[in-house]
């Protein structure tokens, strides 16, 4: 046994391990455990999923049965969808059986040298901007000639890339993944921002922030100072090197903006990195994402030139402030990835005049303060989805002169055919068995187009999750783009 191997306890060859969840994460965990020599059993609530694994020779059990016999297992490795209050994790805790997430398993296997020399992990988290920042970081590392892999909550699970040659991992992690990764100690970790999100999973904002803060327990902690909740995490970070980034002029130990240039005063005395106007992501959010990515790149000695090169050639991902079309002087922007109020606010504030398409599942988050801050930018609003009433109430309080249209369908589960309407117009969608999301978005785009004038932006930035009417944020964005193309023909 090597000196590093005890970090893997209670995992050992032949150990009975329960894998919770049969999705993409579960498949990656099964492959890693089999490679290690453990004896995994997979549990899932979906009988069809279990049958698929049985056909592949995997031992399976229902989630409820697994909870009843939890003491048979030395370890549970869970998919991030299992909240700590779910019956299975609670049963494991009561029986004294450790619960890891797939990221925790990946971290321990990598640190133990199971895949060769351990990689240096650079981890990005936050309520918003994770994917763009992590992609920027990976581009910077690649431009510098460093062997980097993009993984985590973007691209492939970390476990799926560890057998590939690399020096560095650019890892996007969600609060769910971080909750189940208590021993993670990255080379550098960044918390971009903290806003109300996933409170239905974490229970409280404090627990959500504590999960995010786990990325700050490694060597270098990077935090967005313009976000008060994120900034508060820096003083308690365990990392010996603490770095902040801001939109204003940086102090020593920070990255920021001076004279239209991104400047590093944390890893150099005073190093100019790149011009602000070379950042392709619109608005302050693009500058902040670039600063965070640059901070993590600088913490592993990436020079200024490849950082600038990566940003100049960077392309924004799908459904992230993506311009779909410009027609009759109106710009149509798909920011379907804005799945919480904080993200929607950043999106709306990037444009001077906005017809806002919003609504869906708010997941317990409040939109009131966000609507108040961005009310001056709104020239119209089109509301969709189950929780559109909460958005309408906020608009009635803080933007009473903004015209509002509700897109209503009675066929979607949990939605009312005749909702409470706050002095607004109502567009009723007749859903006759086709694609509900397409019908809703077609009506929403038509209503937004009627409200917009030349120079305005019709912006899909829902502030909410999509699963009440769509398969996911990408499906919602695709429906928006298709509706726009059909409308401007």
UniProtKB/Swiss-Prot annotation:
UniProt-listed InterPro entries: Mur-like_cat_sf, Mur_ligase_C, Mur_ligase_C_dom_sf, Mur_ligase_cen, MurD
Biological process annotations from GO: cell division; cell wall organization; peptidoglycan biosynthetic process; regulation of cell shape
Highest taxon in the source lineage: Bacteria
EC number: 6.3.2.9
Localization in the cell: Cytoplasm
Reactions that this protein is recorded to catalyse: UDP-N-acetyl-alpha-D-muramoyl-L-alanine + D-glutamate + ATP = UDP-N-acetyl-alpha-D-muramoyl-L-alanyl-D-glutamate + ADP + phosphate + H(+)
Keyword Cell division: yes
GO cellular component, one term: cytoplasm
Binding site for ATP: 126-132
UniProt KW keywords: ATP-binding, Cell cycle, Cell division, Cell shape, Cell wall biogenesis/degradation, Cytoplasm, Ligase, Nucleotide-binding, Peptidoglycan synthesis
One GO MF term: UDP-N-acetylmuramoylalanine-D-glutamate ligase activity
Pfam families for this protein: Mur_ligase_C, Mur_ligase_M
Pathway of action: Cell wall biogenesis; peptidoglycan biosynthesis
Family (UniProt): Belongs to the MurCDEF family.
Function: Cell wall formation. Catalyzes the addition of glutamate to the nucleotide precursor UDP-N-acetylmuramoyl-L-alanine (UMA).
Name the record gives this protein: UDP-N-acetylmuramoylalanine--D-glutamate ligase
Organism: Mycobacterium avium (strain 104)
